[in-house]
């Protein structure tokens, strides 16, 4: 039937998605570090948001060949958690600092670029970057498991 793919075709498509989105997410992370080190915290927050969004996109596309048209990283995280529950461990919401930091990251997609009132601290960025490092590792693990098997 049209639209039915063999397992090998699915694997090839998943690998292409992984190669594209994982590299893109990693590139945004490098740009985040550059901007943070220059003291451009709002721009760094936007770049970090893009890195997160793209790691989630990498997982969704590599594992399901589907990506909703959304920049809402909380929604994307929930979709990834349906693929692997370990995604719920990334960006925990167990205390006020974690919740505030994640909200700042979520808002960065719009506010970091367009609002003169957007603020994020180095401490918040450092915490979030640590979570993105975990996200990167989990993304690679989950996607490679899908591609390899």
Model-derived features: positions:
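Terminal alpha-helical segments
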Residues: 1-149
């Amino acid at each position: 039937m049209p639209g039915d793919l063999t397992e090998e075709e699915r694997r090839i498509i998943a690998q292409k998605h992984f190669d594209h989105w994982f590299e893109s997410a990693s590139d945004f992370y490098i740009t985040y570090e550059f901007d943070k080190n220059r003291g451009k915290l709002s721009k760094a927050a936007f770049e970090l948001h893009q890195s997160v969004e793209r790691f989630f996109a990498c997982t969704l596309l590599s594992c399901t060949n589907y990506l909703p048209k959304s920049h809402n990283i909380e929604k994307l995280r929930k979709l990834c958690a349906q693929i692997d529950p370990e995604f719920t461990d990334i960006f925990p919401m167990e205390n006020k600092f974690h919740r505030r930091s994640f909200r700042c990251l979520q808002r960065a997609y719009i506010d970091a670029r367009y609002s003169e009132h957007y603020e994020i601290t180095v401490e918040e960025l450092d915490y979030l970057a640590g979570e993105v490092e975990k996200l990167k590792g989990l993304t690679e693990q989950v996607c490679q498991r899908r591609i390899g098997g």
